[in-house]
Amino acid sequence: MKIIFVRHGHPNYADDCLTPLGRRQARAAAERLKDAKIDRFYSSSCGRAYETACYIAELHGGAAVKKLDFMREISWGIEGTSDHTHPWDLADRRVAEGKDVMDRDWQNDPDYAGHTLLRSYLAVAAAFDRWLDELGYRREGNYYRVTRENRDVLLLASHGGSSSAVLAHAFGLPFGFVCHALRPGFTAITEVSLEGEVGALISPTFLLANDIEHIKSLSDPSDYNN
């Protein structure tokens, strides 16, 4: 099985939809993926992600897009305080301060332990595992047991935070490292493969990460992921 992750296009966050630039980016992503074999289309239930997925599905015969609530954007901040530090800013701050973004025990670090994003991360990770279980991949420790054959290609349009959370979990990587290293741009395409014989214990593999070549002619670089 292969999952094609696509971040939503440039958003109007207030109205949870795409801006004119975001729609151009979504159309560019659709054109980029028009010849890809995609069996099923999914998105988070947020409007900006669903709209992005619909542009892509339109070039695949207008296929239906199924919404997944668990892939909505994660929350962050420390409740009861004015600290609403974005996960990417938090990761960058840790690097600037010389802290280890590869710490395997990151969930117990004070920077994360009291942070709303940790609860969001854990909820998204657990729901993602339940979804994969339905698709034939059962979580065992840090890996996945193949429980049935599945050669489908799935498209999943979502968000920078929720996609980084599930990728960090699936690959057993610290969330802060994925935030700092991957940084998905608008309509960035990341492809992940889960392959193995039925009964095998497997780990996913990256086929492509954060591909935004299709939007580089549309706007200034400052509009790629802000």
Please provide the spans of the model-predicted regions.
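Short catalytic helix/loop segments, enriched in acidic residues and glycine
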Residues: 18-33
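Short, well-ordered beta-to-alpha junction loops that form the rim of enzyme active sites
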Residues: 45-46, 70, 148-161
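Internal catalytic-core helix/loop-beta-alpha segment
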Residues: 107-143
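Phosphate-coordination/substrate-recognition cap region in phosphate-metabolizing enzymes
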Residues: 30-106
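Extended, charge-rich low-complexity interaction segments
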Residues: 95-112, 213-226
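Acidic, low-complexity terminal tails and accessory targeting/binding regions
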Residues: 62, 74-90, 138, 142-153, ...
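Extreme N-terminal starter segment of soluble prokaryotic enzymes
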Residues: 1-4
